Amino acid sequence: MLQTGIKGTGEALVTEELSARAMGSGELPVYATPAMLALVEETAWKSVAPALEPGQGTVGTKLDFSHLAATPLGRKVRCETRLTEIDRRRLVFSAEVWDEAGKIGEGTHERFIVDSEKFLAKADAR
């Protein structure tokens, strides 16, 4: 059952592929903001997926996030999300991301519940 308070946890190892240099968001070999945001989205959707009806999925619609500190290559990062609000099909999550030295990111993320087949048909029709 979908209810507020659902928590999720995700982890990643910061590799060259997840660096700002490789992702094009900067020139330095540190954890890229786009990689951190992807980890937040993945952690959030996976946390609520078991509570959805068959045929439903979620799509990300909004991120309001601060990247607080740089993480060098080779470190592990951990994301924790919590579902804080449900407004019909809109889901709001709080999220925090840490590396081994401390918090590196925090913010909110919104997703919408969709009927997967209808959503894909509408996307294909665009």
Predicted regions and their residues:
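Catalytic strand-loop segment that frames the active site of acyl-thioester-processing enzymes
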Residues: 1-32
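Hydrophobic residues in beta-strands and at strand termini
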Residues: 14-16, 67, 113
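Residues at secondary-structure transition points
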Residues: 27-35, 92, 114
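Hydrophobic beta-sheet segments that form the core/acyl-binding groove
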Residues: 65-100
